[in-house]
């Protein structure tokens, strides 16, 4: 129809209709070879004119598009074939088959509803093909039976097929089908035409390039033409006014009789009958009364250019309520309802009810009101930013035209330098090669053992609860004769920091250099791995007999795991039993305790010579999280719950400080120390002696911080009292003069030792390994689009690469696994092993983790994998991917970087990552925008400040994507920088974005093509080139005049090619066509970089699509499902008239 606007593609149609725009849609063929179509809306004023033109046969290629959510009449698409010599087709002729089908349909309806009064009059059209006289095609429509939507109709038709063929009530309408698959069968009525947006041919219409039309069996008037349409215009525009009572009764009966039956959309034919087969479809479950039915619900993209929302070119949002003036609620509800709902969910957080109701027009929209109420409850704890509304405006008006002029989230007053990774330099950190670590520690311990001055021993002076004599006796009894000291050990990830320390600890324990030790780790899974690592190191050492001969006072060791469900981890019970069984009553043994911070109260002894804390900041984070979750007492009052949490926290802190106070040596290991963490650990080392400096110094510090005088006086008094208590334990160092003649001693001088000398200066050590020739990742690629990175991941899976994927969200893990499995099941012959490591899948299977990781070809892991777990094997995986989402409740960026280093050596040494932040994040309060001064506060205060600062930084990243992206880039490069030698200089990995790589590839391709074009022009001037470049060419006109022209190179054909290729003409001339002339459009033939336009001559032919065999096994997807009832007696008479 020329008066229709054929400008919509199907994407635009789907988008508008999905958002609630209800109009009848028609389609027409525009291509012979591909079957492509154009679509148009059929508005009410044009509907009658449309029916008139269809009745007058003015158009040839029109279809109606079946709307999925609108009522639809019962319709069938039937095909029958006369039986041939190969057994293909029906034994019945077309008239008998049609009558039999109609009778079986009547019987099935009465089977479902014995009291049915349905009008069974059918309107049938028939298509006769001259090139295939044995094929008979019918369309049958029953106007008296209307279903609520296409899904209920599909359930009815599939149940009808199940009743006939699966229950074998009547097998006469099922037959074998010709083609490659001889067992593939089909039914008289097609079962595959009840899909979304199905194009159903209208009466008197033919396909493009074919003259075979659908002709009614009896003559119809203009008033009757609408009975031959499946969905009249008012069915789509006013669905509530359509009577679907008969269809509802049939649907209810189908649900009752066929609930739980797996229905199929095609059949298989064998000698004994027809067997159904299950088809995999993407669907969701919806309830229909008390029953569940499955319907397909594909998600559609929004065509933003179709949205017409009133506004101006430049959008300025100065207040929250300004959002509403750029959105018309009536337009959104009518055409884009899902956008309307999502917009309400976003802006309802910060707009009052009165404003929203006034904007909504006080409509009684129950769904919208319910969503507003429920989403306000969910977001009551934090404020939203209106991110979805801003994004919607940006897509409609353009990102550069939308300005958010509201009070912005306050910028941080500093760069959170105390919360970011420190820069390791030789002036502060002492470089030590990993192979020299044990020697360094052992030599230090041996020197300390030769020093027996107890008056400045840190372990003694730290014990303030006993007198001096008891401290000396206790220190001698435990052989803790070393001075109190502390070491911070850092280095690049994979430099064997923890392994070196464990090696030193085990050797010192065997050699009786240290009495006992405690290892504190962040997680239970890592604690189990630490126990096994210590055990293996111990066994390896005692098996070296030459080495053991050099040790005089050898001891055996016992490893005690103190953490929740310790002995449920495979192998720990056996290790403990083996070590304890080797110890007799006469043996002296050393004890190594391995625990997590939360389980420190389970430790029986409170005196350990050496304390080793691995990943201290992760210990702190896990401790705070678990202390809130592990409340076994049911608490109804929130204040009581907080009180219990504080009590648990204080108890753990007191236990930790008591153990570290009694220790002689503290070792902290981390690959990414921050100033906050260093100060926290230093405070733990100093213990009660944290208060440093004179009273005047403290007064100046407090005044500079703006503390009022009353608080200053209170703090100064507390400092004085604490200094007095400290000075009570300061001993006087006396120098004596001994007189041999008189055998007397006199004091020469007395020197007071202040508390600064009770502890050794802290040592900062950076470990490097010369054996490591390159870092974990040498190349880091950032993807701005998540889908682009997902496509790259799927390409690697197709190529058979082994991949490890890190995710910050558990749901993301499941989604990626499902996507990979879906792709591989469709495209891969050999399916790869794809698995996931989450908290749920890992529970109770911790001992199988290593074997599971090594057996998978694609493994998707979440943060549950934990810090400290590592897989150093070269080539275990080919590449790594990281999906990082920064939002409430997800791991922090630094934690995700630690997670991405669990696999130490991928084949390509490449990390692909994508980072996204929540569009509705928290607005950080004032405390999150400044650093606190930690000078002179207690360990508990340090602990709270460290945790709070990290949490505040995470919230700032949530609300500032650019800051989060920059922080991620810097942290990745610093974390995976390779320390080369004792200079501690880092060789940083390269960092690129995917867009930069694609741009560079495009530029390289341009340069190569340009060079190739120049070479071709130089050596073969008679050839046009097909590369994207230009050059000057000398040309000669017909009269001999020479001139120069710029030619776009295209390797197509040589200049001396005179005869065009007539291959397509020969094919068309030899094809079997139907009656009438067929005019084909020009066809482009691509044959190995040769491009020519071939224009076909008019003549009898048929389209390439129709030339394909109708016997092909995939025809079931193209034909359609239809049923028919009719008065067939008039058929021959009508055909003679035509």
Curated annotation (Swiss-Prot):
One of its GO terms (molecular function) is DNA-directed DNA polymerase activity. It comes from the Viruses. Residues 985-1015, 1094-1138 are annotated as: Disordered. One of its GO terms (biological process) is error-prone translesion synthesis. Residues 1110-1138 have a biased composition (Acidic residues). It comes from Ostreid herpesvirus 1 (isolate France) (OsHV-1). This is Uncharacterized protein ORF49.
């Amino acid at each position: 129809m020329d008066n229709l606007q054929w400008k919509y593609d199907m994407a635009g149609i789907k988008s508008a209709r999905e958002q609630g725009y209800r109009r009848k849609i028609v389609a027409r063929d525009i291509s012979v070879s591909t079957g492509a179509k154009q679509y148009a809306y059929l508005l009410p004023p044009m509907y009658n004119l449309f029916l008139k033109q269809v009745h007058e046969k003015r158009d040839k290629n029109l279809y109606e598009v079946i709307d999925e959510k609108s009522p639809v009449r019962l319709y069938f698409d039937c095909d029958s074939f006369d039986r041939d010599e190969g057994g293909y087709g029906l034994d019945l002729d077309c008239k008998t088959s049609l009558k039999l089908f109609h009778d079986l349909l009547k019987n099935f309806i009465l089977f479902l509803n014995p009291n049915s009064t349905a009008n069974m009059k059918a309107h049938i059209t028939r298509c006769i093909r001259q090139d295939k006289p044995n094929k008979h095609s019918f369309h049958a429509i029953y106007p008296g039976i209307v279903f609520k939507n296409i899904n209920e109709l599909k359930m009815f038709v599939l149940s009808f097929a199940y009743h006939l063929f699966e229950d074998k009530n009547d097998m006469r309408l099922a037959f074998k089908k010709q083609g490659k698959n001889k067992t593939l069968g089909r039914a008289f009525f097609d079962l595959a035409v009840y899909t979304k947006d199905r194009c159903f041919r209208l009466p008197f219409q033919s396909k493009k390039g074919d003259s075979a039309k659908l002709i009614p069996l009896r003559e119809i008037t203009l008033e009757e033409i609408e009975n031959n349409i499946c969905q009249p215009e008012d069915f789509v525009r006013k669905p509530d006014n359509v009577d679907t009572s008969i269809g509802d009764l049939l649907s209810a009966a189908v649900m009752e009789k066929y609930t739980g039956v797996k229905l199929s959309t095609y059949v298989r034919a064998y000698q004994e009958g027809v067997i159904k087969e299950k088809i995999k479809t993407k669907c969701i479950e919806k309830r229909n009364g008390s029953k569940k039915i499955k319907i397909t619900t594909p998600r559609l993209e929004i065509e933003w250019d179709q949205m017409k929302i009133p506004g101006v070119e430049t959008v300025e949002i100065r207040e929250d309520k300004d959002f509403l003036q750029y959105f018309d609620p009536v337009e959104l509800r009518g055409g884009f309802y899902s956008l309307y709902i999502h917009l309400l969910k976003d802006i309802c957080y910060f707009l009052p009810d009165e404003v929203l109701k006034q904007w909504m027009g006080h409509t009684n929209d129950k769904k919208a009101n319910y969503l507003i109420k429920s989403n306000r409850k969910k977001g009551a704890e934090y404020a939203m930013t209106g991110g979805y509304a801003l994004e919607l405006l940006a897509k409609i008006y353009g990102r550069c035209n939308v300005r958010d002029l509201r009070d912005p989230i306050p910028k941080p007053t500093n760069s959170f330098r105390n919360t970011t990774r420190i820069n390791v330099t030789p002036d502060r950190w002492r470089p030590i090669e990993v192979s020299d670590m044990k020697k360094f520690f052992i030599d230090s311990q041996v020197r300390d053992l030769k020093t027996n001055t107890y008056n400045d021993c840190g372990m003694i002076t730290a014990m303030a609860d006993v007198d001096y004599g008891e401290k000396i006796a206790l220190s001698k009894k435990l052989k803790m004769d070393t001075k109190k000291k502390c070491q911070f050990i850092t280095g690049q990830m994979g430099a064997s920091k923890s392994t070196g320390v464990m090696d030193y600890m085990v050797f010192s324990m065997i050699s009786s250099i240290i009495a006992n030790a405690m290892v504190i780790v962040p997680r239970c899974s890592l604690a189990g791995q630490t126990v096994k690592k210590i055990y293996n190191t111990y066994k390896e050492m005692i098996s070296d007999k030459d080495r053991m001969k050099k040790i005089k006072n050898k001891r055996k060791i016992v490893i005690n795991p103190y953490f929740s469900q310790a002995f449920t981890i495979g192998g720990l019970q056996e290790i403990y039993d083996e070590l304890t069984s080797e110890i007799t009553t006469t043996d002296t043994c050393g004890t190594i305790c391995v625990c997590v911070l939360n389980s420190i109260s389970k430790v029986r002894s409170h005196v350990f010579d050496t304390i080793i804390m691995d990943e201290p900041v992760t210990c702190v984070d896990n401790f705070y999280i678990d202390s809130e979750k592990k409340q076994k007492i049911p608490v109804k009052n929130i204040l009581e719950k907080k009180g219990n949490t504080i009590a648990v926290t204080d108890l753990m802190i007191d236990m930790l400080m008591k153990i570290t106070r009694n220790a002689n040596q503290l070792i902290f290991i981390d690959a990414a120390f921050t100033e906050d963490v260093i100060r926290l650990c230093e405070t733990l080392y100093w213990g009660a002696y944290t208060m440093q400096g004179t009273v005047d110094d403290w007064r100046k510090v407090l005044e500079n911080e703006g503390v009022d005088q009353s608080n200053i006086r209170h703090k100064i008094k507390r400092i004085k009292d604490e200094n007095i208590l400290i000075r009570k334990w300061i001993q006087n160092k006396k120098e004596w003069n001994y007189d041999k003649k008189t055998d007397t001693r006199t004091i020469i001088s007395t020197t007071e030792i202040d508390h600064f000398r009770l502890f050794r200066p802290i040592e900062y050590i950076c470990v490097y390994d010369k054996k490591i020739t390159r870092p974990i990742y040498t190349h880091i690629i950032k993807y701005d689009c998540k889908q682009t990175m997902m496509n790259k991941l799927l390409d690697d899976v197709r190529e058979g690469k082994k991949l490890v994927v890190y995710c910050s969200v558990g749901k993301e893990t499941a989604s990626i696994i499902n996507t990979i499995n879906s792709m591989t099941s469709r495209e891969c012959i050999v399916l790869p092993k794809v698995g996931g490591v989450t908290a749920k899948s890992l529970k109770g299977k911790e001992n199988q983790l290593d074997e599971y990781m090594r057996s998978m070809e694609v493994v998707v892991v979440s943060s549950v994998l934990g810090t400290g777990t590592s897989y150093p094997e070269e080539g275990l995986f080919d590449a790594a991917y990281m999906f990082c989402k920064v939002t409430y409740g997800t791991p922090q960026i630094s934690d995700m970087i630690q997670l991405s280093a669990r696999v130490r050596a991928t084949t390509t040494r490449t990390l692909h990552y994508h980072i996204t932040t929540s569009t509705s994040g928290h607005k950080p309060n004032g405390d999150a925008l400044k650093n606190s001064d930690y000078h002179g506060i207690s360990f508990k205060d340090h602990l709270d400040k460290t945790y709070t600062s990290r949490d505040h930084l995470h919230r700032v990243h949530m609300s500032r994507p650019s800051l989060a992206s920059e922080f991620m880039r810097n942290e990745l490069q610093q974390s995976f920088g390779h320390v080369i030698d004792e200079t501690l200089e880092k060789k940083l990995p390269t960092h690129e974005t995917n867009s930069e790589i694609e741009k560079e590839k495009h530029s390289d391709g341009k340069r190569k093509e340009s060079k190739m074009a120049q070479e071709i022009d130089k050596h073969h001037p008679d050839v046009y080139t097909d590369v994207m470049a230009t050059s000057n060419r000398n040309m000669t006109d017909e009269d001999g005049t020479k001139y120069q022209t710029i030619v776009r190179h295209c390797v197509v054909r040589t200049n001396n090619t005179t005869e065009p290729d007539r291959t397509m003409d020969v094919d068309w001339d030899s094809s079997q066509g139907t009656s009438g002339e067929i005019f084909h459009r020009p066809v482009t033939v691509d044959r190995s970089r040769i491009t020519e336009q071939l224009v076909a001559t008019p003549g009898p032919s048929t389209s390439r699509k129709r030339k394909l065999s109708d016997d092909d096994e995939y025809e079931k997807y193209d034909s359609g499902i239809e049923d028919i009832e009719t008065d067939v007696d008039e058929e021959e008479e009508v055909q003679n008239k035509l």
